[in-house]
């Protein structure tokens, strides 16, 4: 039995090498953003006041061509994580907030010119998070959940400056 198992394990990679793999080698475009900045939070369930402060964000975007429609449809996903610490105007109370946002979209590619790509598609987005107010005793926190469906369009223009490649991209999403 051990010999049979060993022969099988040696045979599987050889069979896999015989596959006719016609996958096109597409790159995955990925970008990650780390940010720190000012936040304004107003949740009338917790307080009628606007809380201001600072927060941190990590945003990751991945874009990849798929096999759909003869490799003319790309998949784009965003993952965004936010944390914020804010205080009321009198600085007598503070709040903490945290959100996770995920978006998944598919775009069909049109190429009217060699340097210009136009993309059209749709995306779905989901957000979950919380706001915790340190001053409230009875209802100290509120949960946030959102989902939406969006129409999405993108334009990508590629050019060179002194033999350095550049790309300009503009994207718009409209909730339906």
Protein language model features and the residues they cover:
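Residues that define the transmembrane beta-barrel architecture of outer-membrane proteins
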Residues: 50-58, 94-102, 116, 141-151
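Outer-membrane beta-barrel transmembrane domain signature
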Residues: 138-176
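Outer-envelope beta-barrel architecture signal
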Residues: 24-32, 69-77, 114-122, 162-172
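Cleavable N-terminal export/targeting peptides
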Residues: 1-27
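Transmembrane beta-strands of outer-membrane beta-barrel pores
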Residues: 36-42, 81-87, 124-132, 157-159, ...
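Residues on the lipid-exposed face of transmembrane beta-strands in outer-membrane beta-barrel proteins
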Residues: 58-66, 100-108, 122, 151-157, ...
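Extracellular loop and loop/strand-boundary signature of outer-membrane beta-barrel proteins
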Residues: 42-50, 86-94, 136-142
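Short glycine/proline- and aromatic-enriched beta-strand/turn motifs that initiate or cap beta-hairpins
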Residues: 17-78, 86
């Amino acid at each position: 039995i051990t010999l049979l198992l060993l022969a099988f394990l040696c045979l599987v990679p050889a069979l896999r090498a015989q596959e006719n793999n016609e996958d096109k080698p597409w790159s995955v475009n990925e970008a990650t953003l780390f940010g720190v900045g000012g936040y304004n939070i107003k949740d009338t369930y917790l307080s009628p006041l606007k809380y201001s402060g600072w927060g941190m964000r990590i945003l990751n975007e991945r874009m990849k061509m798929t096999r759909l429609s003869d490799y003319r449809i790309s998949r784009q996903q965003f993952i965004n994580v936010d944390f914020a610490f804010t205080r009321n105007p009198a600085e007598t109370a503070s709040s903490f907030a945290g959100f996770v946002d995920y978006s998944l979209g598919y775009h069909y590619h049109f190429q009217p010119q060699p340097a210009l790509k136009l993309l059209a598609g749709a995306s779905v987005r989901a957000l979950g998070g919380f706001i915790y107010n340190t001053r409230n005793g009875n209802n100290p926190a509120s949960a946030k959940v959102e989902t939406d469906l969006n129409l999405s369009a993108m334009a990508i223009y590629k050019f060179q400056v002194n033999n350095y490649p550049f790309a300009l991209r503009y994207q718009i999403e409209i909730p339906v």
